[in-house]
């Protein structure tokens, strides 16, 4: 295959022929995947390892971005990250817990009890990362569409 060949991403490979006989079925499938991965991202955000001396913890969000990009591709993955960001900005506690919230659980917090934070991305310490998730998921999705998730290209 040529270097410019397009590959199917994981979601398209697994869901081949599922409710895609019509344009509406395809749109519904895409919307369900976008919402589902916004929820996966909210779950990944709750996996937190607090680092001493910083307000930005290590979270499972990095895994969530990579998973969304590789699974959904460059069109749906950024939309799922954008939806995740908008849900948090609307007041739902889907972002990683603040370091103060993590302190009451020790240095590690794993999903339950739910301690997510919310707020405008430009007013929280991790806001730049959240905006960056949109671009990172697009890059990973594009690489997956080029076949970089199948074999080394070096």
Name each model feature, range by range.
Residues 2-22, 29, 35, 43, ...:
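Short helix-perturbing small/polar motifs within transmembrane alpha-helices
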Residues 66-71, 84-118:
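Glycine/small-residue-rich loop that forms an oxyanion/phosphate-binding "nest" at active or ligand-binding sites
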Residues 2-86, 90:
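Hydrophobic transmembrane alpha-helices
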């Amino acid at each position: 295959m040529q270097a410019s060949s397009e590959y199917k991403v994981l979601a398209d490979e697994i869901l081949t022929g599922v409710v895609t006989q019509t344009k509406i079925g395809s749109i519904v499938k895409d919307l369900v995947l976008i919402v589902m991965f916004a929820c996966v991202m909210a779950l990944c955000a709750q996996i937190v390892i607090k680092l001493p001396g910083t307000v930005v913890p290590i979270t499972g969000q990095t895994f969530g971005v990579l998973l969304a990009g590789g699974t959904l591709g460059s069109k749906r993955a950024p939309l799922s990250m954008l939806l995740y960001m908008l849900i948090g900005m609307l007041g739902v506690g889907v972002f990683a817990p603040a370091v103060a919230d993590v302190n009451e659980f020790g240095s590690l917090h794993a999903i339950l009890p739910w301690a997510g934070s919310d707020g405008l991305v430009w007013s929280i310490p991790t806001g730049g990362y959240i905006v960056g998730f949109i671009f990172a998921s697009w890059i990973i999705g594009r690489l997956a569409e080029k076949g970089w998730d199948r074999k080394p290209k070096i």
